Amino acid sequence: MFNKKYILYDIIKENEYKIWRSIIMPRIVARGIKKEDLKKVSTELFDTIAKIIDRPRGAFTLDLVESVAILDGEEISRANIEIGWVARPVEVCEKVANAVGEIIKPLGYETVMVSFKSIDLAYEFTFTK
């Protein structure tokens, strides 16, 4: 039988777990948005989300995956923001999604999609030099 608690504490010492978790969450991945647009709003994005979830800005990561959305052979203007973190209540997700939408929508994208991905730290491994 799988015991998540055992695995977590077996991989990461209990006193290091909270520190490690706070360093890497949340992870934001943006697609379908211009690099210059994302750079323009990155500070506001971090500040806004940090305030809502009470996390230090230094715990965030932000990556841009350049992509183009296509519908019926035509490019469409759609920004897709994915936030990966340890699961939070739907009310928190709604609040963050609304705030992110308010920040991205004025940039002129027809559609702004915000989604959340729950990360189970028992299945995550980080390798460094």
What does each of the following model-derived ranges do?
Residues 3-24:
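Short, Lys/Arg-enriched N-terminal segments with co-localized hydrophobic residues
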Residues 24-129:
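Interaction-mediating elements
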